[in-house]
């Protein structure tokens, strides 16, 4: 229906505005110019000089918990979704999540289906059967969404704000030092800053080219810049690319705990390890944000209240 299309378009304009802090009319123009492609619309606004680099809209809607733990030296991060925030905060739900993390660590299942077929700790039942029981007792649907596991090197787990983020950091540690605090601080950085890449050497060439094209278009569309020599533009673009790496790559990001170290994350890791008398190398990490990428059905708030009042009759 036309009204549904209009609602969807209005929602897209709202989302783009939240991502870019650009006015509604310009957001509408950007979406019209790019046939509703959100990423292309962000680039269109940037090329016109209307928007700075926008973070992807965190379309976080599903409730649940992102949990990380180290079990017998094996790092695990897992996301389990529920229908309401209330259920996710119950002891029964958290016990389930912790036990699932233990199963991932000990059984090394290949995927979510394999995890569901595993035996549940302290029971003869499978994970699926236990979850069916929990659904009955808690009174709402629950889903294991995803998990990741590190068996090598040293893993450090961090859970932020009661399970909104679960981060697992994997480090290569030498010199017999305890790198737990280093790992926790790096994990907190990842939770807070959501880097797109770990190191600038890992940024795909296509992404580098795309960012460079945006910067060049931005200068070409600026009357003050358009007439400047190509060499000057190249120098400015190089400076913009350095800023791009600093914003989007973990090891090049400014370390948020400036009370501990002033400089980038790579510098913090090296400095902290040296103070402990050893060396630490960042290997890998996984960041789960609860409900990331899951779109929840948009309900009209007034209709929702009315529906609840009718239910109470």
What are these regions (language model features)?
Residues 1-6:
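Short, small-residue-biased leader/transition segments that mark boundaries at the very start
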Residues 7-313:
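N-terminal assembly/interaction segments in proteins that build large macromolecular machines
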């Amino acid at each position: 229906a036309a009204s549904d299309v209009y609602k969807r378009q209005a929602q897209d304009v709202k989302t783009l505005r939240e991502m870019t802090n650009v006015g509604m009319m310009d957001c509408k123009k950007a979406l019209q110019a790019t046939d509703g492609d959100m990423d292309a619309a962000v680039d269109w606004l940037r090329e016109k000089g209307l928007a700075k680099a926008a973070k992807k809209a965190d379309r976080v809607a599903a409730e649940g918990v992102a949990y990380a733990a180290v079990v017998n030296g094996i790092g695990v991060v897992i996301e389990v979704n529920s229908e309401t925030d209330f259920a996710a905060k119950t002891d029964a739900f958290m016990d389930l999540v912790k036990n699932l993390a233990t199963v991932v660590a000990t059984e090394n299942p290949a995927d979510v289906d394999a995890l569901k077929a595993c035996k549940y700790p302290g029971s003869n039942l499978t994970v699926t059967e236990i979850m069916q029981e929990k659904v009955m007792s808690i009174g709402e649907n629950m889903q294991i969404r995803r998990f990741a596991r590190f068996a090598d090197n040293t893993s450090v787990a961090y859970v932020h704000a009661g399970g909104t983020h679960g981060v697992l950091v994997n480090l290569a540690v030498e010199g017999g030092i305890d790198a737990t605090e280093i790992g926790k601080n790096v994990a907190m950085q990842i939770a807070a800053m959501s880097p797109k890449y770990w190191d600038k050497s890992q940024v795909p060439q296509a992404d580098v080219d795309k960012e460079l094209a945006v910067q060049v278009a931005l200068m070409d569309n600026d009357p003050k810049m358009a007439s400047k020599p190509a060499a000057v533009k190249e120098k400015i673009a190089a400076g913009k690319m350095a800023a791009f790496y600093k914003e989007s790559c973990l090891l090049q990001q400014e370390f948020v705990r400036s009370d501990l170290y002033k400089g980038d994350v790579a510098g913090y890791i090296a400095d902290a390890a040296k103070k402990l008398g050893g060396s630490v190398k960042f290997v890998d990490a996984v960041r789960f944000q609860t409900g990331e990428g899951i779109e929840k059905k948009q309900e009209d708030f007034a209709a929702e209240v009315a529906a609840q009042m009718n239910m109470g009759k």
